[in-house]
């Protein structure tokens, strides 16, 4: 297992551990961060994949809006869902 993959696994497990008692939106924030980390791992394997790069950039750009601009955050998730189809 590569370092980035192990770090993602650690992040997922510790995030799941921390969820009880946290606001509901935190789950979506953590999943979005995990998706971004996975995009970065995949980009290391496919650095020429422009669609994957665009997906990672969009996640990075708007993932912080969950608490201050929640509607924009949900719209970003809709957009990146469509971008995922293009990555297939």
Tell where the protein language model's regions lie, with residue ranges.
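Short terminal alpha-helical segments
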Residues: 1-26, 78-88
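Alpha-solenoid helical-repeat scaffolds
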Residues: 2-6, 25, 29, 46, ...
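Amphipathic alpha-helical interaction modules
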Residues: 18-60
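Amphipathic alpha-helical binding modules
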Residues: 59-88
């Amino acid at each position: 297992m590569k370092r980035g993959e192990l770090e993602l696994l650690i992040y997922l497990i510790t995030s799941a551990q921390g969820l009880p008692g946290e606001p509901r939106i935190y789950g979506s924030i953590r999943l979005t961060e995990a998706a971004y980390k996975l995009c970065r791992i995949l980009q290391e394997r496919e650095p020429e994949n422009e669609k994957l790069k665009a997906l990672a950039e969009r996640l990075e750009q708007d993932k912080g809006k969950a608490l201050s601009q929640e509607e924009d955050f949900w719209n970003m998730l809709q957009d990146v869902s469509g971008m995922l189809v293009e990555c297939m």
